[in-house]
Amino acid sequence: MSNKNPLNNSNGSNSSTIVNSDKFLVKIHSLSVSHTSKSSNIYLVGDFDQFKQFKTETKKSSSTHGSCIYNEFAMEFQYETKYIHKLDHKHFKICVYKKKSIGSDKYIGSFGVDLYTLATGPISHDVVFQKDNTGVGRLQFRLEMNHITDIQISFKSILLSNLMKQSNYQIDYSLNKINPLKSSIIENTICPSWYNQSSILMNISLKDLVDGSIFFNLKDTKSSKVIGELKLPVKSIFSFVEGDIKIVKTLLYNEKQNKICDACIEIQFNNIPQLAQLRGGIQTEQGIRGAESFFSGVPLPKIIGEISNASTSDGYSKEAQLQHVKLPDGWESRIDPVSGKVFYLNHNNKTTSWISPLEHAPVKKRTPTVVISNTTILDNNNNNNNNNNNNNNNNNNNNNNINNTNNIQQKQQAQQQPVQPPPQPVQQQVQQPQQKEKEKEKEINAEDYKISRPKKTPATPEEAAVIIQRTFRNHKKQSYNKTIRNSKTIIPPNNVQQQQPQQTEKPSIYQVFGQQIDQGLPNGWEVRQDQFGRVFYVDHINRATTWTRPTVKHPKQHQQATLVQQRK
């Protein structure tokens, strides 16, 4: 069954702005009540955000536990809303009534829950329904609420190489083998390449997407045979980031599982659903029990995600609640032997992170930074960040804002897509951009690969911005500046940071040159020593510094220069 929301109907010329509605597939079934009026005719009335209403048939409750089971009831519909960010202000309510032969029916009690909890929590519910804030019975039901969007899977490039023979090739691709798309035919080649192929468009939920696979079939058009196949599980490459781009390096095999060719595929996911329900578990009046987070980064219900650290009325704190929610499939928590802190290991893509996959971040667009090789995610972030930091240090006067933006984006990406290992703190990256040797870390063997101990990152993007600004100002004060505004603090002419000598006591300028240091210098010049013991020369007339010792001009030239200076 489907029902259109009348609020979505436009009035033609009166509508100036079109707002797209988010859609949810809702299914309600397995309703039952217990511990209520015994041997009574009971029926239920439901209201889903004033969008869809229902009423069950009347059944007689048992004489022992006062229970009624409505196995025959099941309802499906498509719910639409323009305000997905306000689901916590929308509610689903079930009222329990006792049918009377004479007079109006008796209201027994009701239960209500917000739609955000339904869209992010478990499917099963076993809760207390109340009347005047007093529990009068129990209500059981299952409610599936799947956020669906028109997902777009784009293929920026499909590159094949090392084919056995030169021929004409075509490749078709699909999601879950539904409506496969075909590429153009590349003739007389052993390395066919396709760029910007038609995108896969499918109205699907996040669960169906992540649990699905992308299939590729390579066809030799001369023989009209499929010579190679590839099944790419979405779970192995997907990250809960809008516009994320993955570069997959893998192999195509024939029916006998023999290698046919190498493949490099660039895939992008757009318009992904934002919400998904937990796997398994049940919701009760005491919270959620036995559930598993669907995927890293997917929002959690408020009953878990927004409970304060203090114990709740039923004695459960936020940490206690989280213990009843399992990590997503393929995730494991471990304790760092050095710091004693808990970190998280993702066996799906062999990465580590300090951030729990149960903590979600808002959907953000980002540039491609992750490469996947043989179903293993490789880290390109460190090299890119080091290059960016080197360039920023060489252009200090122009790139302050770029530094701030890059580091804030780096923090957001670290939360949304863990890397191996997590990036270094921003302050260390800026102060030491050319540092090649890193501190050796203890490594933890995890099956057939090694995972380095994660490194700590700033807590928030704002904290990272403060650190980068403070570091930039300190670095700028120490860099080369031709204009000397304070003669007491003259900066030597050095725009490249150099290592400090190992000696603890550096010789003074008088120990190096004796008493002849100021002799032989032109008028207005002075010799000084920097913090590393190096000698430089200060031109007070032009307000400049140099490493080169100035030479005394010929007396005639010196007199001419003096006259010119006096005229000025």
Curated annotation (Swiss-Prot):
Lineage start: Eukaryota, Amoebozoa, Evosea, Eumycetozoa, Dictyostelia
Subunit structure: Interacts with calmodulin in the absence of Ca(2+).
Gene3D superfamilies on file: 2.20.70.10, C2 domain
PROSITE patterns (alphabetical): C2 (PS50004), WW_DOMAIN_1 (PS01159), WW_DOMAIN_2 (PS50020)
Main location: nucleus
Organism: Dictyostelium discoideum (Social amoeba)
Protein name as it appears in the record: WW domain-containing protein A
Domain WW: 325-359, 519-552
Gene deletion effect: Cells fail to complete the final step of cytokinesis and form multinucleated cells when grown on a solid surface. Null mutants show excessive accumulation of F-actin around the periphery of the ventral surface. When grown in suspension, mutants lacking dwwA complete cytokinesis normally. Mutants lacking the N-terminal C2 domain fail to localize to the cell cortex.
Keywords: Calmodulin-binding, Cell cycle, Cell division, Cytoplasm, Cytoskeleton, Nucleus, Repeat
GO aspect biological process, one term: cell migration
Gene Ontology cellular-component annotations: cell cortex; cytoplasm; cytoskeleton; nucleolus; nucleus
Signal peptide stretch: none
Ranges of Low complexity composition bias in the record: 380-418
GO molecular function, one term: molecular adaptor activity
UniProt-listed InterPro entries: C2_dom (IPR000008), C2_domain_sf (IPR035892), WW_dom (IPR001202), WW_dom_sf (IPR036020), YAP1 (IPR051583)
Gene: dwwA
Subcellular location: Nucleus; Nucleus, Nucleolus; Cytoplasm, Cell cortex; Cytoplasm, Cytoskeleton
Function: Involved in regulation of actin cytoskeleton organization and cytokinesis.
